[in-house]
């Protein structure tokens, strides 16, 4: 008994140590709440709800795929005063981390397959399960499979995590596939470590999110390009398998402790990360993302990406642009204080952002085990950075409201820092090769909603941190968030 007590105590101390390693919050929850309220939906606690995926249905209901293998239908989740009624459509699945809906059928991505599920007799329960694809192997709990919403052509994209950070133990781990409606499995990319979601970006191009780890210095949003290599070479045995051969020859081995920008110049298939999320400052395990297509019902950020984070229980924003054939962009703080580790988000037509997840497996900031929440715009527009875009001599920064002209034109209100990471086989990376670019000119637009910053010292391949200092709106309001982070893969010509 004494040895058992010692073991349990050691486990508790280890868990506490892990929990202490969670990053700090931004400290902006009170300011954020004026603009976006968090509403907890009253779901029966006996459900032990662990959300893994969402899809908003044509009839106004919400479907939830759960980690416990259910597909639940929620009626009333999108009502102004939510009184949700939950029914079980399907059960007995395994970690439903992707859910789509098309022509009366669900497309569920679970650990071992993509399944098309339908209700033929109309009783509200699934009675037909069609295996669309199970070409990949499965040997370990870490081998998560994430699925996209159903695409306009009926396809589902699946990204497959490795057996662990350093191991490839089953077929096609670390690969991505396009699963067609007739069940074909088309290889798309390789080099994935541990994804957290896959979906189109705001421009309709397929992306996925990756967690920090070996060959990934920080969490990031990556372009899921056909034939692309996402960075982790442990998956290379998959190129010797029949479907892997369709991607062509395996890429060159990356050089350990190099830089991603340099290696992507040497290895044709290797793609730079489109948006780097600085570790702990902008999440620790980013997950689901969706573009805001609500047409302004969710505030001023329409057509931008909203990105959840499991560890810190936060939602962030991201914007992307293509420069010289390479995707890049920025990430921005948005809303902290969610109830648990976010694995799934979804917009409703009414302008709500539904969030849900779990706290099982790894430490999370949120303190609620089973919760379904939604973010609602209060109608009060926050004064915040709207978007940062790269320019040939600096950046163009826009805001959600007109700025005070004096503060907008003052170059001392803009501080920049650039850095990159080791591209290495070890876990994560410190921020390295730091520089301090200088804003030499700030040219406001005539309406006060944007400014062109001329910057001396831009560094291609670096993340550029922004601190916006004493900027004020035309009404004297400070920014809700004073930081943003742009990944500058290419300087526009």
Task: Annotate each PLM feature.
Residues 5-19:
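Hydrophobic h-region of N-terminal signal peptides that target proteins for export
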Residues 18-394, 405:
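Beta-propeller domains with acidic blade repeats across secreted/periplasmic ectodomains
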Residues 378-381, 489-493:
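Extracellular interdomain linker/stem segments of modular secreted and single-pass surface proteins
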Residues 389, 443-447:
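Blade-terminus and WD-like Trp-Asp/Gly-His loop motifs, strongest in beta-propeller folds
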Residues 393-397, 451:
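Structural beta-strand segments of beta-rich domains
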Residues 396-441, 466-473, 482-487:
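Short, surface-exposed alpha-helix to beta-strand junction/turn motifs within ectodomains of secreted
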Residues 452-456:
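Exposed aromatic-hydrophobic patches
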Residues 457-462:
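Surface-exposed, short loops/turns at beta-strand junctions within beta-sandwich domains
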């Amino acid at each position: 008994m004494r040895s058992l007590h010692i073991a349990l105590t050691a486990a508790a101390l280890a868990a506490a140590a892990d929990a202490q390693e969670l990053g700090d919050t931004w400290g902006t929850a009170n300011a954020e709440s004026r603009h976006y309220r968090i509403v907890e939906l009253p779901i029966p606690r006996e459900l032990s709800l662990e959300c893994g995926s969402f899809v908003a249905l044509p009839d106004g209901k919400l479907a939830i795929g759960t980690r416990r293998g259910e597909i639940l239908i929620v009626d009333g989740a999108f009502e102004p005063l939510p009184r949700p009624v939950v029914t079980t459509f399907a059960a007995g699945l395994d970690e439903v981390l992707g859910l789509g809906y098309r022509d009366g059928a669900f497309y569920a991505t679970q650990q071992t397959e993509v399944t098309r599920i339908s209700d033929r007799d109309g009783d509200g329960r699934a009675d037909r399960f069609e295996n669309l694809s199970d070409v990949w192997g499965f040997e370990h709990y870490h081998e998560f499979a994430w699925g996209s919403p159903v695409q306009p052509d009926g396809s589902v994209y699946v990204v497959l995590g490795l057996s662990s950070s350093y191991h490839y133990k089953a077929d096609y781990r670390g690969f991505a596939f396009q699963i067609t409606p007739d069940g074909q499995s088309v290889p798309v990319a390789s080099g994935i470590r541990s994804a957290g979601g896959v979906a189109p970006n705001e421009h309709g191009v397929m992306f996925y999110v990756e967690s920090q780890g070996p060959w990934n210095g920080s969490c990031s949003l990556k372009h899921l390009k056909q034939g692309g290599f996402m960075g982790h070479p442990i998956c290379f045995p998959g190129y010797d398998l029949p479907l892997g051969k369709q991607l062509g020859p395996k890429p060159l081995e990356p050089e350990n402790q190099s830089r991603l920008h340099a290696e992507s110049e040497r290895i044709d298939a290797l793609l730079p990360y489109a948006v780097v999320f600085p570790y702990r400052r902008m999440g620790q395990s980013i997950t689901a993302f969706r573009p805001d297509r609500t047409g302004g019902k969710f505030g001023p950020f329409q057509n931008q990406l909203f990105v959840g984070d499991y560890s810190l229980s936060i939602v962030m924003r991201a914007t992307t642009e293509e420069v010289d054939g390479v995707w890049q962009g920025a990430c921005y703080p948005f809303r902290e204080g969610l109830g648990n580790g976010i694995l799934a988000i979804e917009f409703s037509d009414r302008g709500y952002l539904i969030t849900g997840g779990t706290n099982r497996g790894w430490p999370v900031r949120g303190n609620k085990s089973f919760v379904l929440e939604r973010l609602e715009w209060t109608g009060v527009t926050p004064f915040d950075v709207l978007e940062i875009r790269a320019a040939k001599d600096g950046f163009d920064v826009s805001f959600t409201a007109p700025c005070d002209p004096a503060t907008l034109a003052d170059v001392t209100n803009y501080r920049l820092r650039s850095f990159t990471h080791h591209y290495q086989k070890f876990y994560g990376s410190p921020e390295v090769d730091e520089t301090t670019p200088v804003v030499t000119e700030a040219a406001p637009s005539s309406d006060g909603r944007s400014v062109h910053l001329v910057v001396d010292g831009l560094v291609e391949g670096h993340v550029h941190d922004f601190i916006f200092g004493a900027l004020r709106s035309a009404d004297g309001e400070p920014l809700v968030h004073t930081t943003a982070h742009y990944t500058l893969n290419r300087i526009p010509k």
